[in-house]
Amino acid sequence: MGTKDTTQKRLEDYEDIFADISNVLLYDGKDVIKENELETVTAKDTYTVEQQIHEVERDVAKRWRHHSLHISLIGLENQTDPDYKMPLRVICYDGASYRAQLNADESKKTYPVITLVLYMGTEKHWTAPKQLTDCFKYDERLGKFISNYKINVVELAWLSDEQIMKFKTEFRNFVELLRDTRLGRKPQYSPIQLKHVHELLQLMRVMSGNDEYEQLLNQTTNNLKQNKLKGDDITMKKIVSLGFDEARAEARAAGRTEGMAEGKAEGRAQEKFATAKRMLALGKSLQDIMLITDLPMSKIQELQTEVKPA
């Protein structure tokens, strides 16, 4: 399915996704940057130190042109964990881009470089430095002479619901997954029509650690071939609904073979508990059980203490 780094880049590299991210984070969701105004630039820059050539590689970078004028170079850097030296890394990325402008034809106008650090952690806030002077100790008397470089860290899982709703592409669904993972609840997906289904599901798989997203990807591929999904129907809600129908039926059938009669007598709630216990015994992930049974994470964790793995 690919590594986190690879799958993150793969989705973000699409012009519509990149423009959407940039518009929400730079222009409060206004449709300022058009996808047809973006051009991909090489993610690698080189520089020479002591006669040795070194490379600096960004995650994703695009040049924004409007009416043939360069407005800015925008770079995205993905982080799943806080990086203490991130300000130093961003300086290297930005510095390499400015060096390229310095070495270019003098007739070409220079333009600003903007780097957005997309923090995808869900367990804790970004705890690493956000500016250069927090990376080291220094004589305070020298403070006014030190150029303090600040970085733009965006904690995706902590964006407000209002901010998340400003995303117009399926990147909104990904941010919703991060938010709901942080809150320990069943993902609540907006009905956004998907253009990059495979890339989104691959990213959700590696970021959540839930193998069921790989099954969803395979089922979705088949559903697309069979025209069960098309046009406006291609949304995360529809994909999850179709994809988990079979898993839900199998889980309930398995539960019934091991005592669902008593669960029926006690009502629908007990049926869900029995299904969850069966899935726990089979080693299914808590996230998957929550998706199938609609039980809160706290209840599933409580049931987990009562179940021995098969």
PLM region spans:
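Conserved single-residue anchors adjacent to enzymatic active/cofactor-binding motifs
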Residues: M1-Q226, A310
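Short, charged alpha-helical interaction segments and adjacent helix-coil junctions
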Residues: H67-T80, R179-A310
